Amino acid sequence: MTTPFKRVHLIVMDSVGIGEAPDAAAFNDEGSHTLKHTLEGFNQTLPNLEKLGLGNIEELPVVNKVEQPGAFYTKLSEASVGKDTMTGHWEIMGLNIMQPFKVYPNGFPDELIQEIEEMTGRKVVANKPASGTAIIDELGEHQMKTGDLIVYTSADPVLQIAAHEDIIPLEELYDICEKVRELTKDPKYLIGRVIARPYVGEPGNFTRTSNRHDYALKPFGKTVMNTLKDNNYDVIAIGKINDIYDGEGVTEAIRTKNNMDGMDQLINVVKKDFNGISFLNLVDFDALYGHRRDKEGYAQAIKDFDERLPELIDNLQEDDLVIITADHGNDPIADGTDHTREYIPVLMFSPKIDKYHELSGDSTFSSIGATIADNFNVELPEFGKSYLNEMGVEH
């Protein structure tokens, strides 16, 4: 059976939200608007995102509304009860997460720390949100002397364990993380990811190694990616995507170093012949700029992404569809360091389409997954609606 688009390239600009969601107040996020606040005062233009119609979704600084947008455009609000990366991505692929992952801005509960200490026979130090490099600078020497576990978190629902490779061998650190992963599946903790963070070096000159290992949770149901894989389509995960879904529904995983490397890897994939989807997460917006409330850096990162779009577009095949979206907000002028509950922008375009218009909004990110499933004639997810008819695409 032929499909309207042979390939779909899905790009998630991690945290690039487009205004407070209808239920933002319930998340203490009233007034949040990542794109607007990031671009206020920015003295450069975003010509390629403007041409696609980003400024048609919502009035934005720097990005004007255009008469003839180069993409279908809309915005979606989140149905799931959460505003983290895993929840947003899982919803994009058709799930509705009713029990949110937990974040720990004041560190983990004493009860959990005690359980970790009893289970491992090692004392826990730190137990606070911290930058991974800063925490080993602060406690790395102590850890080497004592063999304690450096346990810390971030603004995401993660528990990270740092240890010097000469003091706690990798196998032991991995074993500890596996056991902590089991502990934290308990609904009272519900931590999205446990991460082994080994490091080497001497006091004053520690470096984290590439032996990091993530212990994620599998999605709580069958995603559109699973359905595509089951139907022998390619699902190429680029960047954080493989980790976010714990490998579920992935046929090939490609690691990335940063946003620009992510775009390089995507363009390499686009040049190859395959049948299915590529799925890229660009994490720098969130990790380097949103959480750090670095408005200028965030705006420049959007500019850098904008500059890569012509190269992507030049390499597309006639029957490719590109979808650009986000997974939550992370307003750089909001209080604290957490994500913000926002609408996500959606831009969809293909070389085979020359006329575009606004699409109706929806109250779930799953409409992205539903559109992809519909395109490939596979089972649609329980949530979301396909946009193919609104796009005027015969299928």
Swiss-Prot record:
GO terms for molecular function: magnesium ion binding; manganese ion binding; phosphopentomutase activity. Binds 2 manganese ions. It catalyses: 2-deoxy-alpha-D-ribose 1-phosphate = 2-deoxy-D-ribose 5-phosphate; alpha-D-ribose 1-phosphate = D-ribose 5-phosphate. This is Phosphopentomutase. Mn(2+) 1 binds at D14, D327, H328. It comes from Staphylococcus haemolyticus (strain JCSC1435). Its EC number is 5.4.2.7. InterPro entries: Alkaline_phosphatase_core_sf, DeoB, Metalloenzyme, Phosphopentomutase_DeoB_cap_sf.
